[in-house]
């Protein structure tokens, strides 16, 4: 029974190759067949591995060749660009160093024409004088300074000379009229600070110089016209939007006051805008007001000499 069990596997193996009894030869044959199969498997694996290695090597060479080719082409492009730039630089250098020939000079005119042209030029030069060129392109800057009290005194003297019919008018009277209006507006709270300043006095003088006539017959009339000019000065130069009318009225009829205001506006509107926009005009009016005091001194001197 043990023999049968030991031979039964060999019998099954033997049937794989050929029919026959199970012997030791069959075992060797089976073993040889196994070895042959192993050899064949090894050969096939070796054969399959060798082409794979070759394929990998070939693909690596192709990749290296692809990587190398762009570098070589890039180097070729760089050398080509360098050559082109060198050619351009040489051409630019040639253009920059190129010197144009001097233009041909016209032929000299005959001596007779030359003498005639010279005499004509000299005569024309003698006839046409050179225009005078001013050294200073801008107008001369004039600086004038004066205090408020000094300008008010000049304004009072101007009014006294203008209204020559008013024999009892003093230069301080117009100043008192102006000061009283300014003080009343301060006390009533219509303004935070006094309006009587040098600039505003200059503006008032500009109005009075063209509005107040020399035919004024009374102090009351002069005061009415002067306060009308003062009201317009407040309205144009003051800090507040509006001012009360009562401090400026010296008569019961308001229509007469407004009529004077309209006439002054129609007459002096352009100059009121000019003195605010043109500093040279303001300086000129300032100088004229300051010179009013000097004119009074000259008048007194002439009266003394006549006596």
From Swiss-Prot:
Positions of modified residues (Phosphothreonine): 138
User: What the entry says about post-translational processing?
Assistant: The p35 form is proteolytically cleaved by calpain, giving rise to the p25 form. P35 has a 5 to 10 fold shorter half-life compared to p25. The conversion results in deregulation of the CDK5 kinase: p25/CDK5 kinase displays an increased and altered tau phosphorylation in comparison to the p35/CDK5 kinase in vivo. Myristoylated. A proper myristoylation signal is essential for the proper distribution of p35.
GO BP: axon guidance; axonal fasciculation; brain development; cerebellum development; embryo development ending in birth or egg hatching; ephrin receptor signaling pathway; G protein-coupled acetylcholine receptor signaling pathway; G1 to G0 transition involved in cell differentiation
Chain intervals with Pro residues compositional bias: 100-110
Q: Where is the composition biased (Polar residues)?
A: 112-125
Lipid-conjugated positions (N-myristoyl glycine): 2
Question: In chain numbering, where does the site feature Cleavage fall?
Answer: 98-99
A Pfam family of this chain: CDK5_activator
Q: Per its record, what are the GO molecular function terms?
A: actin filament binding; alpha-tubulin binding; beta-tubulin binding; cadherin binding; calcium ion binding; cyclin-dependent protein serine/threonine kinase activator activity; ionotropic glutamate receptor binding; kinase activity
Task: Enumerate the UniProt keywords alphabetically.
Answer: Biological rhythms, Cell membrane, Cell projection, Cytoplasm, Lipoprotein, Membrane, Myristate, Nucleus, Phosphoprotein, Ubl conjugation
The terms describing its cellular component in GO are: axon; contractile muscle fiber; cyclin-dependent protein kinase holoenzyme complex; cytoplasm; dendrite; dendritic spine; growth cone; membrane
What are the start and end residues of every segment in region (Disordered)?
97-135
Q: In which tissues is it expressed?
A: Brain and neuron specific.
Phosphoserine-modified residues are 8
Question: What binding partners and quaternary form does the record give?
Answer: Heterodimer composed of a catalytic subunit CDK5 and a regulatory subunit CDK5R1 (p25) and macromolecular complex composed of at least CDK5, CDK5R1 (p35) and CDK5RAP1 or CDK5RAP2 or CDK5RAP3. Only the heterodimer shows kinase activity. Interacts with EPHA4 and NGEF; may mediate the activation of NGEF by EPHA4. Interacts with RASGRF2. The complex p35/CDK5 interacts with CLOCK.
Name the family. Answer: Belongs to the cyclin-dependent kinase 5 activator family.
Purpose? p35 is a neuron specific activator of CDK5. The complex p35/CDK5 is required for neurite outgrowth and cortical lamination. Involved in dendritic spine morphogenesis by mediating the EFNA1-EPHA4 signaling. Activator of TPKII. The complex p35/CDK5 participates in the regulation of the circadian clock by modulating the function of CLOCK protein: phosphorylates CLOCK at 'Thr-451' and 'Thr-461' and regulates the transcriptional activity of the CLOCK-BMAL1 heterodimer in association with altered stability and subcellular distribution.
- In its UniProt entry, what is this protein called? Cyclin-dependent kinase 5 activator 1
